[in-house]
């Protein structure tokens, strides 16, 4: 068995085209284009790269993109004041704070300062709570992107045993909630989990997000499983790989996401979907 590749680049491009069309329809109807404010603190090269990609994507589909590049020594108070200004700016639909923030700034406090209806990353406790209550509004981008990939490939996951390896607030935990909402029986594993191999071997659907290259051997993959690799790791030779040993896993899985080109593009695609949704909320309110 050789797994079918789940092409995140292709699906992300489809979504961008769909959103661009909806934006043009809004503009023709006399409505404003969606507006996303992206806040970058400091000069982390990886963060700068991600922010540049997000801004270019927004502009390419007709969004208004506002850039707020703050110095590394900005205070938490100053950052919170900027967020308050963006919260009350009626022309701004979405606010994105690029993580990680510098040492000395409380990530949780900053994310909680964003108005829930402008929280296009889906990290605010209100939005996470809505997801837990089976009434999601703005959803965390990477987990929602995974669900979209499965839907676009017509992969039925209802009733499957889903195992999430990694329990981060950004990916693992909301991923578990998304899979539960989709009808899976969900196990979330973490650093204290015993018998990780046994959990992985029982997974009909395996989602891995730990940030460790090749952490899951292909021999652990259940024959015919669906493998979603969210990890992005850069090796010393410059090669980018995931958390799953791809060359081994592809021989056992039924479906698998590559790294790069799998889940990564879907995170940005979901961000623009969320921003358009936030724009619609603003109009309704």
UniProtKB/Swiss-Prot annotation:
Gene Ontology biological-process entries: L-histidine biosynthetic process; methionine biosynthetic process; purine nucleotide biosynthetic process; tetrahydrofolate interconversion
Pathway annotation: One-carbon metabolism; tetrahydrofolate interconversion
UniProt-recorded Gene Ontology molecular function terms: methenyltetrahydrofolate cyclohydrolase activity; methylenetetrahydrofolate dehydrogenase (NADP+) activity
Record: residues binding NADP(+): 166-168, 232
Domain of life: Bacteria
Name of one Pfam family that matches: THF_DHG_CYH
GO cellular component terms, semicolon-separated: cytosol
The protein's role, per its UniProt record: Catalyzes the oxidation of 5,10-methylenetetrahydrofolate to 5,10-methenyltetrahydrofolate and then the hydrolysis of 5,10-methenyltetrahydrofolate to 10-formyltetrahydrofolate.
Name of the protein: Bifunctional protein FolD
Organism field: Baumannia cicadellinicola subsp. Homalodisca coagulata
Lineage per the UniProt record: Bacteria, Pseudomonadati, Pseudomonadota, Gammaproteobacteria, Candidatus Palibaumannia
The encoding gene: folD
């Amino acid at each position: 068995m050789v797994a079918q590749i789940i092409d995140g680049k292709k699906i992300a491009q489809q979504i961008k085209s769909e959103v661009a069309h909806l934006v043009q329809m809004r503009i023709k109807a006399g409505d404003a284009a969606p507006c996303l404010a992206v806040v970058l603190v400091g000069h982390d090269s990886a963060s700068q790269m991600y922010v540049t990609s997000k801004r270019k994507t927004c502009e390419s589909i007709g969004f208004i993109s506002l850039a707020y590049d703050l110095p590394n020594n900005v205070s938490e108070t100053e950052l919170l004041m900027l967020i308050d200004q963006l919260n009350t700016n009626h022309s701004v639909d979405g606010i994105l704070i690029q993580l990680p923030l510098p040492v000395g700034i409380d990530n949780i406090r900053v994310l909680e300062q964003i108005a829930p209806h402008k929280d296009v990353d889906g990290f605010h406790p209100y939005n996470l709570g809505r997801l837990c209550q089976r009434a999601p509004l703005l959803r965390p981008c990477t987990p929602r992107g995974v669900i979209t990939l499965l839907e676009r490939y017509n992969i039925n996951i209802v009733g499957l045993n889903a195992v999430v390896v990694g329990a981060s607030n950004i990916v693992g935990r909301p991923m578990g909630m998304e899979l539960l909402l989709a009808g899976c029986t969900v196990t979330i594993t973490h650093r204290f989990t015993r018998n990780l191999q046994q959990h992985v071997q029982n997974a009909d659907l395996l989602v891995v997000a730990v940030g460790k290259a090749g952490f899951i051997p292909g021999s652990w993959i259940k024959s015919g499983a669906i493998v979603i690799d969210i990890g992005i790791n850069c090796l010393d030779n410059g090669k980018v790989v995931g958390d799953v040993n791809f060359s081994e896993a592809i021989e056992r899985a039924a479906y698998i996401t590559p790294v790069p080109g799998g889940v990564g593009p879907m995170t940005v695609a979901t961000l623009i979907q969320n921003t358009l949704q936030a724009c619609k909320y603003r109009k309704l309110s």
